Swiss-Prot record:
It comes from the Bacteria. Its EC number is 1.1.-.-. NCBIfam families: L_lactate_LldD, PRK11197.1. It is a peripheral membrane protein. Residues 1-380 form the FMN hydroxy acid dehydrogenase domain. FMN binds at residues 106, 127, 155, 251, 306-330. Its cofactor is FMN. This is L-lactate dehydrogenase. The active site is at 275 (proton acceptor). Belongs to the FMN-dependent alpha-hydroxy acid dehydrogenase family. Keywords: Cell inner membrane, Cell membrane, Flavoprotein, FMN, Membrane, Oxidoreductase. InterPro entries: Aldolase_TIM, Alpha-hydoxy_acid_DH_FMN, FMN-dep_DH, FMN_HAD, FMN_hydac_DH_AS, LldD.
Length: 381
């Protein structure tokens, strides 16, 4: 197997994983137009090539809050990561820490906070959903604090679950889902043994620690579905801001007015994100939304971005459009599914190499020198 880009990991992951798991990660909402535009819109951004600038000294290092990152990349929160590799959250976190970048743990991870945090030598980030069960939210925040988490990523673009039609076709949901998942596992023996057997318990660790009983896949879907809160408003977040004294990032911003509201709220950062095209189909890609948001709030808080980033070249494009740092989700998940921690390590090395090539050939010697002047044209211009 030749791995030269993140797309190779995607192809290999499709072969290795049971279809219900591959398509759960790979799919988006409705007809998946936004999912596709996240990638194609980034690919349509042309960089301005510059030469003869003595690029012998180059630095990808950047500062974010009180952290130093080896490059402006963090691993995004991805639910059920531990179903893609044995104790997957631990493996991904170790790869990120070894590369000098943050790992963001999902609320709905397989491994609990208490298993992942001690496995790495730098503080991880923790992602939290807005849920009706405020007791769970407080419990999760308290446990994250106790584990040394400094940065909270608060996801606000999921007041209701997205309509992900591909899940019904793949067996993740829909008629005879449990039976279809078992049959798929039987035809993927490598995954079935390594993750299905050796990766137990298949629990949602953060939730079961609070509820006091194991939570399987069906319980996960039911519990979350009943706990998303469509009544949420900025006012409801005030108690979290009072409770959490570390950096707080609001994830799921696609509109400049919402970005301004995040500044008023006192957020330390935002993530320009459409949830990887998994929530509302037909909204702007992150690449299209980012410039206007950067114009509105750049300098008032840190701007992160995700959705559609598949290479180090895409990282450079997002930075040029106004992001300070980017989050990668599917790309690292595919690498994790194929080769575990070593796969994520290799992926991050590929991203760094691709960033270095792009920076040398655009004349940017540091991350701060990647600006809109690095673009021939912006998307849609």
């Amino acid at each position: 197997m030749i791995i030269s880009a993140s797309t190779d990991y995607r192809a290999a992951a499709q072969r290795k994983l049971p279809p219900f798991l591959f398509h759960y990660a790979d799919g988006g909402a409705y007809a998946e137009h936004t999912l596709r535009h996240n990638v194609s819109d980034l690919a349509g951004i042309a960089l301005r090539q510059r030469v003869l600038n003595n690029m012998s000294e180059l630095s990808l290092e950047t500062k974010l809050f009180d952290e130093t990152l080896s490059m402006p990349v963090a691993l995004a929160p991805v639910g059920l990561t531990g179903m893609y590799a044995r104790r997957g959250e631990v493996q991904a976190a170790r790869a990120a820490a070894a590369h000098g970048i943050p790992f963001t743990m999902s609320t709905v991870s397989v491994c609990p906070i208490e298993e992942v945090a001690p496995a790495i030598n730098r503080p991880m980030w923790f992602q939290l959903y807005v849920l009706k069960d405020r007791g769970f939210m407080r419990n999760a925040l308290e446990r994250a604090k106790a584990a040394g988490v400094k940065t909270l990523v608060f996801t606000v673009d999921m007041p209701v679950p997205g309509a992900r039609y591909r899940d019904a076709h793949s067996g993740m949901s829909g008629k005879n889902g449990p039976l279809r998942r078992v049959l798929q596992a039987m035809t993927h023996p490598e995954w079935a043994w390594d993750v299905g057997v050796m990766g137990r318990p298949h629990d949602l660790g953060n939730i079961s620690k609070y509820r006091g009983n194991p939570t399987g896949l069906a319980d996960y879907i039911g519990w979350l579905g009943n706990n998303f809160d469509p009544s949420i408003s900025w006012k409801d977040l005030e108690w979290i801001r009072e409770f959490w004294d570390g950096p707080m990032i609001i994830k799921g911003i696609l509109d400049a007015d919402d970005a301004r509201d995040a500044v008023k709220f006192g957020a330390d950062g935002i993530v320009v994100s459409n949830h990887g095209g998994r929530q509302l189909d037909g909204v702007l890609s992150s690449a299209r939304a980012l410039p206007a948001i950067a114009d509105a709030v750049k300098g008032d808080l840190k701007i992160l971005a995700d959705s559609g980033i598949r290479s180090g070249l895409d990282v450079v494009r997002m930075i040029a459009l106004g992001a300070d740092t980017v989050l990668i989700g599917r790309a690292f998940l595919y690498a994790l599914a194929v080769h575990g921690q070593a796969g994520v390590k290799n992926l991050l090395e590929l991203f760094e190499k691709e960033m270095r090539v792009a920076m040398v050939l655009t004349g940017a010697k540091s991350i701060s020198e990647i600006t809109r002047d690095s673009l021939v044209r912006e998307l849609g211009a």
